[in-house]
């Protein structure tokens, strides 16, 4: 009971692709899905590890692991903000995310992720380690069904997001993400080259 969300994993010469088959999602209760997070801890790094994330903020930016800036993390819609999305989500944006990509550099290992399906319905999140979560991690979150959410008790220790309205229409685009492993000692230059050659 609950939800069935089919995900297909496939390997190619580029790397590994994870695809959510939206037409086969089943909702078996009165509760419905609004957003889907895909592989949130893929490439996560502990507090002891050295590295950075590359995010598509403008033409690209680097977020160093364990940098102490733990308040909101990085949150950005791919390409631009949807005018129908919540004002609270829009307020966190910095530059427009111009490319559907993000990168992970962890010690000697590096990978580039390319969002290959559902990019315009995707929001990218990145967080560095803190007292609550001892990991540095980055992930895409896709909007399966649009909704309106308000923040309640935002100036307290226990703020709540309350969903007021959800649309019946769901996304008919499969959400897909390609992880491309890079050569040893790959860095942000190698990530840019891999995306250019993709």
Q: Each PLM stretch: what is its role?
A:
Residues 1-198:
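Carbohydrate-recognition beta-sandwich/jelly-roll modules
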């Amino acid at each position: 009971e609950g939800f069935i969300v089919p995900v297909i994993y496939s390997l190619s010469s580029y790397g590994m692709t994870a695809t959510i088959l939206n037409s086969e999602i089943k909702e078996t209760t009165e509760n419905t899905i609004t957003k889907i997070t895909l592989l949130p801890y893929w490439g996560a790094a502990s507090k002891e590890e050295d590295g950075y994330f590359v995010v598509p903020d403008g033409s690209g930016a680097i977020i160093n692991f364990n940098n102490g800036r733990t308040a909101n993390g990085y949150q950005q819609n791919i390409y631009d903000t949807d005018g129908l999305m919540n004002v609270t989500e829009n307020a966190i944006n910095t530059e427009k995310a111009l490319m559907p990509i993000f990168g992970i550099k962890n010690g000697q290992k590096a990978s580039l992720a390319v969002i290959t399906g559902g990019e315009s319905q995707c929001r990218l999140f990145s967080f560095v380690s803190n007292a609550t979560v001892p990991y540095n991690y980055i992930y895409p979150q896709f909007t399966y069904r649009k909704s309106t959410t308000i923040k309640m008790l935002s100036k307290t220790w226990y703020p709540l997001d309350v969903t007021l309205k959800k649309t019946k229409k769901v996304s008919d685009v499969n959400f897909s993400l390609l992880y491309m492993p890079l050569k040893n000692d790959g860095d942000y230059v190698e990530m840019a080259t891999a995306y250019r050659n993709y």
